[in-house]
């Protein structure tokens, strides 16, 4: 049982899955530091969409942030309008997150975006990219922006080369 119920937070993100909430939470918690499954709530009896013992919700944290995964059925889906940005310091960290989130059916997108196998959208964003996009020199910002526009997964060395001119 969790030390503190999710309702003790001022706010939490709820992710609506068909029936994969426990699998998704497990992937995210295994991948990211400061992440854990805190509580799994199961149906106390049979109901129209399932049976007693089915997972209803999973209370978990990712990178220290509270989430609730809900097995709500197939009526809702994820969209490009909402994504989770994860900031990275090294190419190895970028590669690890990118590859793990794409495994088993994810879809890469341009400019650091991807859709994982559950349909959740992520942006794996190297901090060097953000530094380049905020650079005080407009020509540097333009080079970094152009380099990013050619990439799916961001290549740290490519962004550093764009910064250096």
List where the protein language model places each region:
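Short aromatic/hydrophobic contact patches that present stacked aromatics
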Residues: 12-14, 57, 83-85
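Core segments of cupin and vicinal oxygen chelate
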Residues: 5, 15-64
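Short, small/polar residue-rich loop motifs at catalytic or cofactor-binding pockets
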Residues: 10, 54, 107-109
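A short, polar/charged loop-to-alpha-helix boundary motif
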Residues: 129-146
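Basic/polar N-terminal segments that are highly enriched at the extreme N-terminus
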Residues: 1-9, 156, 160-165
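Terminal, contiguous helix-loop blocks that mediate binding/assembly
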Residues: 145-161
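Vicinal oxygen chelate
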Residues: 17, 21, 30-31, 62-63, ...
């Amino acid at each position: 049982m969790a030390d503190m119920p999710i309702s003790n937070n001022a706010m939490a993100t709820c992710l609506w899955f068909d029936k994969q909430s426990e699998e998704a939470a497990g992937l995210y918690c295994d991948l990211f530091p400061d992440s854990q499954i805190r509580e799994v709530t199961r149906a106390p009896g049979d109901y129209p969409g399932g049976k007693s013992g089915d997972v209803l919700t999973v209370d978990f944290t990712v990178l220290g942030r509270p989430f609730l995964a809900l097995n709500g059925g197939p009526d809702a889906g994820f969209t490009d309008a909402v994504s989770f940005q994860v900031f990275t310091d090294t190419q190895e960290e970028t590669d690890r997150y990118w590859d793990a989130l794409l495994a088993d059916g994810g879809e890469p997108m341009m400019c650091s975006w991807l859709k994982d196998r559950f349909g959740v959208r992520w942006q794996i964003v190297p901090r060097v990219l953000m530094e380049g996009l905020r650079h005080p020199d407009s020509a540097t910002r333009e080079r970094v922006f152009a380099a990013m526009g050619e990439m799916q997964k961001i290549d740290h060395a490519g962004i550093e080369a764009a910064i250096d001119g």
